[in-house]
Amino acid sequence: MPVMKGLLAPQNTFLDTIATRFDGTHSNFLLANAQGPRGFPIVYCSDGFCELTGYGRTEVMQKTCSCRFLYGPETSEPALQRLQKALEGHQEHRAEICFYRKDGSAFWCLLDMMPIKNELGEVVLFLFSFKDISQSGGPGLGSPGIHGDNNNHENSLGRRGASSRLRSTRRQNRTVLHRLTGHFGRRDQGSVKANSNVFEPKPSVPEYKVASVGGSRCLLLHYSIPKAVWDGLILLATFYVAVTVPYNVCFAGDDDTPITSRHTLVSDIAVEMLFILDIILNFRTTYVSQSGQVVSAPRSIGLHYLATWFFVDLIAALPFDLLYVFNITVTSLVHLLKTVRLLRLLRLLQKLERYSQCSAVVLTLLMSVFALLAHWMACVWYVIGRREMEANDPLLWDIGWLHELGKRLEEPYVNGSAGGPSRRSAYIAALYFTLSSLTSVGFGNVCANTDAEKIFSICTMLIGALMHAVVFGNVTAIIQRMYSRRSLYHSRMKDLKDFIRVHRLPRPLKQRMLEYFQTTWAVNSGIDANELLRDFPDELRADIAMHLNREILQLPLFGAASRGCLRALSLHIKTSFCAPGEFLLRRGDALQAHYYVCSGSLEVLRDNTVLAILGKGDLIGADIPELGQEPGAGAGCVLKTSADVKALTYCGLQQLSSRGLAEVLRLYPEYVAAFRAGLPRDLTFNLRQGSENNGLGRFSRSPRLSQARSDTLGSSSDKTLPSITETEGGMEPGAGSKPRRPLLLPNLSPARPRGSLVSLLGEELPPFSALVSSPSLSPTPSPALAGRGSSPSLHGPPRGSAAWKPPQLLTPPLGTFGPPDLSPRIVDGIEDSSNTAEAPTFRFSKRPEPTRTRSQAPLSGPRLSRELATEAAEEVKEKVCRLNQEISRLNQEVSQLSRELRQVMGLLQARLGPPSHPPDSTWLPDLPCPHQRPPCISPHMSGPPPGLQNTTLAVVHCPASVGTVEIGATPSELRSSMVPPFPSEPDPLGPSPVPEASPLTPSLLKHSFQSGSDTFH
């Protein structure tokens, strides 16, 4: 993988700086929001403060920074007032206050409050530093009133004795020592030196802003363009050293010419100057630490360079050639020290990492390495020939390869050392031999004759075979095996760049994508843990996941969980990464996981106001809003975030998905209660909307509320219909005192059987089937309704008695109902599918409903939310559908009833005999019908005819074969329109006997049976 640029995004390292600076006695601190809407809430608290006070971080967060939870009986009220005044004025404040821990124990605390500003100069945070001074001679816990700052002590000196003065002096001395502690150098072990500003005010704390990378102009960024140009120049110099140093050591050392006259002397000195300058620049060049941070501190840079490459670069930069220039005599072994410069080739490999993704560069590098190896071996081959000549007698020994070369070139050696071929010819011949030996078996024109030469030739052939196989044979396969991860990185990076180019993404978004990819790859090296562990058994995968996620599993929240539960949870935890400035969550987003901060810091924002600052070890998420609902279980439990979560630095996070948590809780129900109780305690900040006021996120849909709401909605749509009742005694029409009964449906009246007509139409409607099911045709009272006083008796006094009165028609006024309410569609029960929700409801009742004006209608729209209105409409539609089904079943029962009535009328006619009136008359005496069906009023009748006082008119309209009964028409009005049921033949039974107790006014009972339409008169 190419060399990392490092984590270059601008970071807000305020939290890390505060934690680093306030170490030791100043590790107890709080951060409060200075722009908060509700009394400067605490947005961060250190672990030292939690240990000092005994409160947990969750208990402290979002409380006011005045720390009222630490107050007690001996806490000075004037000191608290001065603290509040300093907060309101955004001023620095110092005081000694008696606070109380969670267990109730008191302690004296030196409180420092300092405002923190941003880059615009605005006070955005308050920093509170707490120092326990109870053990260092602080004020006695039994002497309340000695609180506050030094001004308060000066005012109280006159009223107190010597002990008070002594304590005040101790406090002043302690303040001076406290300031001296911050100004004396801690790392100076030899001598302690105080700064010149010992008694000056303390230096200001860091600002809450984004820090820039590379604050000094004298620093050279390791990823800048000038640094890249310089690295290229050093690369060429390193190649030059790799070529010239072996050549000068092997060939120039045996030359009698002076070194000062060498052609490469100037270039050698220039390269040495470049190396010396490179050493100087390395002390001012930033580098990337192991954690991925860009280090720009000069001291850290120097220490890092001294510990890594300084000594190698120093030896390579020793000016050996300058010794020759000044005619300083050196031994021949000094020339060998120049070979140490070849160690810079290791730096060369490091520099070439960033260019390794280019195939042309890789090919050039491989060929250069092959040629460089041949060059080095040619130098060694020449040295072997020279040493063979020096070791043997020059007069008798002439079988070396240099002698053979001199003979062929007609430049033989004289006396073993003089003469011979030139240095140039010897180097070319040596390079030719090594290349032919490395690439093949050679041609024999330059061959090895001596034992040393043959041994070297053998080694050259072996190396050549290896290099030939590696470079020209299996180089691609070897590189793929060795650098498969790098190849994957390059392929993904290329795909990412192609994606950016094709979609023309803006430059800021492009930079964010590239940096996120590089940093995440640096963290996990491109290894997908889930893909890697997929083939492992579940037992081993769970153990590995528990080890990788051990930080989040060590929270007290999971302390009550069993090992099996922890293993299941660990399989649903994922590691994520967030760059500075990136939003982890935005307000209103669906919260799909709980996040644990492993490293870095984040801030919680709402309307650009800092609500909390999160650091390592914090848990962010949301509690479970309602009992019985697990996160992610259903659409009704979707949690929305109430604030934005933004990364201040590079953050490493571990996230536990809500869906995975719900699955684990279903597998381990015994842990649900402990998790629900422990989650609010361990959450550093609750992101659930509505968590501030503990309100319900959705409207309750309990059956009781739904029923009440349906009654409210139903009452507004009910329309009053006329009803028929039989008055008792002197009751006037419309003077009923009982409220009308609603229509009873099976699902709303569990006391009634589902198939009962009484349950469908109310108690006022008698059961018609009793007439047929009765063993005798004589009228008998219904036992089911005999004892009920609320409904009229089915069998009143005998018709001939004095107490008997004919039934009367009771109709409400015309203003009570309008024409739409009297539509036959409503009476017949045929509902319009397009207007089902607004269909009026009809009811059978004894008493008409009072007139309801439009202004008295219940207001459902303005008072109900959109969701409530939708639910109400669905419930109304469901009720209408059930009503249609019941009406259809009622039609079938009425049809069956009509057939039974025809049979009964036939039996009555056969038993009572023929009527006593003339044959052309269809009048029959009024017989008491014990099982008369209460009819419904016809929509075209608004009241009884004026001439009728003792009769009742009723017309029953029933859908699908329902009969009609007309009672109360005068003989003159009806004879013209009525047709006798059997006009062609007389009644075989004869006239019916008229009871003696019947009134003088005749009544009409017209019986007409029609088989096609099932209508009877």
From Swiss-Prot:
Places the protein is found: Membrane
One Pfam assignment: PAS_9
Keywords: Coiled coil, Glycoprotein, Ion channel, Ion transport, Membrane, Potassium, Potassium channel, Potassium transport, Transmembrane, Transmembrane helix, Transport, Voltage-gated channel
Region described as cNMP-binding domain: spans on this chain: 557-621
Compositional bias of kind Polar residues: 703-726, 1008-1017
Cytoplasmic side: 1-232, 284-305, 356-364, 476-1017
Broad class of where this protein is predominantly found: membrane
Extracellular membrane side: 254-262, 327-334, 386-427, 449-454
Tissues expressed in: Highly expressed in adult testis, and in adult and embryonic brain. In adult brain found in piriform cortex, olfactory tubercle, cerebral cortex, hippocampus pyramidial cells and dentate gyrus and basal ganglia of caudate/putamen and accumbens nucleus. Detected at intermediate levels in lung, spinal cord, and pituitary.
Residues of the signal peptide: none
MF-aspect GO terms: voltage-gated potassium channel activity
Record-stated family: Belongs to the potassium channel family. H (Eag) (TC 1.A.1.20) subfamily. Kv12.3/KCNH4 sub-subfamily.
Protein name: Voltage-gated delayed rectifier potassium channel KCNH4
Native species: Rattus norvegicus
Gene name in the database record: Kcnh4
